[in-house]
Every structure is written in C-alpha cells, then in structure tokens.
Design a protein with these regions (language model features):
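Surface-exposed, charge/polar-rich loops and edge strands
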Residues: 1-408
Length: 408
C-alpha cells in the first residue's frame, strides 16, 4: 500500500494543548460548545464551527463551512499554526490509564481507499458524509486524521520503538487525563525506508473515521475531475491518517439504550426475552465473554446468553448482531438502528454507571451492556467484504484534531 510524508501545518509547540480537540463526531452541539468554552484556539471551532454561529443556523449549511475556513485561517495567520519546512511523518503516542498506543502519522492514498486496499467495515450515513465532504472541500484541508490499523508482525513495530528515544515535538496531558506525545520523523532516508515497509503491507483497515475517509476520497475524485492536468502526484490524492499495529488498540463496548418496551409490560418483555435467549436474574453489569449481554431493567441486572450460534457467518455471530436480530428487532421493534430514534448508543468509556443513570432517570426503559468486539473480528469482516452493524466498536482514546493538518 502507498504512504507519503507531507509538508503539513501543526501547532507551535506551546500551543498544542490549546489547539488539540476531540474529534467532531464524539460530541453533540452542547458538548462541543462546552469543549471550546474559554479556549479561543480550540480546533473544535474549526471542526464544529456552528457553535459560534447564531442559534438556529443549519449545521450543514455553507455558512458553517465558510466560518470554519475563517477560524482555520485565523489560527495560521496569527502564528498559532506553522508549516513544516520539509515533508515529514510523525509518531503519535496516547496514554490513557494503563493503556498506551503509538501510531504513525502520514498521508495515505485515496486510490488505495477506492480500490479497497484500505478496507472498511461500516456503511456511512449520507448526511454525515456530505457534511465532512463539504468541510474538506471548502477548506482544502484534512481537519482530522482517519484512524487506521494494520495486522501485527510488520516492520511498523520497529519504527515505533526506534523513534521513541528521541526528543518529543509535543508532550502534554489533556483535560480528560489522556497524555499525548508526538515525535517528528524528517530524515529523508528514514522516510524512504517507511515508504518501502508499507509497500510490503498488503492492506490497512479503517478502525474509526469511515465518514472522514469516504469524504476525503470523494474530495480526491472531485479535484481530479476539476484538473485537466491531473498527474496523480497532487496533494489532494492523499489524506491524513494515523496507523496503529492492531495489537496496540483498545476496543471498548458500544452499549445500547432503548426508550420504551414497545408496548410490552415488564413481565411480557421478560417472557419474550426468555424465549429468545437464556435469561438469568442478578448478573454482572458487564458480560464476561462473547454471546453474552448484560441488561439493566427496572433497577435490576439480568444476563442474556445467546445459544444456537454455530454456523452463523462473521457478521451474524457478532454480539451486537445477535442482540439486534433476536431482541431489538423482533421484541422491541427496532428495525433499523441507524435511523430509529427510540434507540441510542453509549460509548464504553462512560461505563455501566451511565446506563443505570439513563434508565433510572426514566428517559430510557432498558439498557444493554455489551462485550467488546475484537480487532480480529473487525478485520475478518472487512476481509470478507462485509459490513458490521452500526455502532459495533468504540475505540479509546480518540485521536485529537488539530495536532496535524494536511492541506491540498
């Protein structure tokens, strides 16, 4: 697969912590506004610029993208972000509690994405993809990196270990306690070696950022069509990503909450559930293995165990698929979890206490605590050209936006 160093923009050293922000899609409007509060340099003002616009502004309007461009250009004009003197790559380490992961920051080929050398496991939602496409096209900037992974056992592991001995470009701990450390790789011979290493890696997988990667590839096709002298070397043919060895990743569960029992009484619901799976009262709040789900209902925890799963394909045997096919759809009437407003999803970073809180508040009737999907499952499904159910994986920690910017 193809990989390339880039001559991008980045924060000046003492502004990295002020600029770096969470990705656009892990916060709602109110949370985005709160994240940027008291932080005039926050990149949240670029990736979610609607937080600065008048109330009632359509979040997918051109006014939002134009304002994002103004905010981005202001960061550059005021000297808070600077362009590298020469093409480079970076190593990016994140430490959250006892977990550490280090990835390589570079640009990856939109052509590889289109040809499934970069493999996907999720469908995109049209409105969300259009939103990121218009932002990227208006700014001519990759505002946030795509989160990629490759199988273990490549030379990428050695690159990561060798570079971490050098002085860091950035090293700060964010408000949420996650430490971010960045090293720059600018030596031409090292960069050339990395390109050759990736020549021998057959594929990568989108772990997180399907809407970003799809919109970036779409931008590449747009600018190619606009350019009669297109050669393939232009910067728009490449998009910003961070790639991690699979063994370093931490996937947390992506839990479910449903607003009502679809007209069932508690007793009727439990009776139907008992026919769909093995049901036990007083279970642990988090399941201890696959084919198991913990459920919180009316102040009590129950254990659900799915049986008769032999012979199911890689997608149908996922816990999120078993729950959807045997409980959410037939009993609770959740036909399409992508669009049904009766269901919501809670990232595992919030823990089971959040599930109890949501149900106890009566905003939701029932919560389901999942066992995490594995990286091996993700890669097997992508290799088979299949699609995972929505909200199957929650990666943590999240890559920050604003630490690296690729322009084209």
């Amino acid at each position: 697969m193809k990989i390339k160093a880039f001559k991008g923009l980045r924060p000046v050293k003492d502004k990295a912590a002020d600029i770096a922000s969470l990705p656009y899609d892990v916060v709602n409007f109110e949370q985005a506004a709160e994240q940027a509060k008291g932080k005039p340099l926050s990149f949240m003002r670029v990736v979610r610029s609607e937080i600065e616009l008048p109330e009632g502004t359509e979040p997918y309007s051109q006014a939002v993208y134009d304002h994002a461009k103004e905010n981005f250009e202001k960061l550059v004009k005021n000297g808070h972000m600077v362009r590298e003197d020469a093409p480079c790559m970076y190593l990016y380490r994140q430490v959250m509690g006892g977990h550490a992961q280090t990835g390589l920051v570079a640009t990856f080929s939109a052509e590889d994405y289109d040809n499934d050398v970069i493999k996907k496991h999720e469908k995109t939602r049209e409105a969300k993809e259009n939103d990121r496409y218009m932002l990227t096209r208006t700014l001519r900037v990759n505002t946030g990196p795509v989160f990629l992974t490759v199988k273990d056992g490549t030379e990428l592991d050695k690159i990561i270990e060798n570079k971490k001995d050098s002085d860091a470009l950035f090293d700060f701990t964010a408000d949420d306690g996650i430490r971010h450390t960045v090293w720059k790789i600018s030596d031409p011979s090292t960069l050339e070696k990395i390109v050759k290493i990736f020549d021998a890696i057959p594929c990568a997988y989108v772990a997180d950022g399907h809407h970003r990667s799809a919109s970036n590839a779409r931008c590449a096709r747009f600018f190619k069509a606009q350019n009669p002298g297109h050669t393939g070397d232009e910067d728009y043919n490449w998009f910003l990503s961070v790639v991690f060895p699979a063994g370093q990743l931490s996937i947390l569960p992506y839990n479910r909450v449903v607003r009502d029992l679809a007209g069932n009484t508690k007793e009727q619901f439990l009776e139907k559930l008992g026919k769909a799976c093995r049901l036990e009262k007083g279970a642990a709040k988090s399941p201890d293995g696959s084919k198991k789900v913990s459920m919180y209902l009316d102040g009590e925890w129950y254990g659900l165990t799915f049986e008769n799963t032999d012979g199911l394909d890689a997608v149908s045997s996922l816990d999120v698929a078993l729950l959807q096919d045997r409980v959410l759809a037939p009993i609770l009437g959740i036909g399409d979890p992508r669009t049904d407003e009766r269901i919501d999803f809670v990232g595992g970073i919030k823990g089971t206490a959040e599930l109890e809180k949501l149900v106890d508040s009566k905003k939701f009737a029932v919560a389901f605590s999942m066992f995490p999907t594995t990286t091996d499952q993700l890669m097997a499904i992508a290799d088979a050209g299949q699609i995972m159910p929505p909200k199957s994986t929650w990666f943590e920690p999240k890559l920050r936006s604003g630490l690296f910017v690729h322009t084209f």
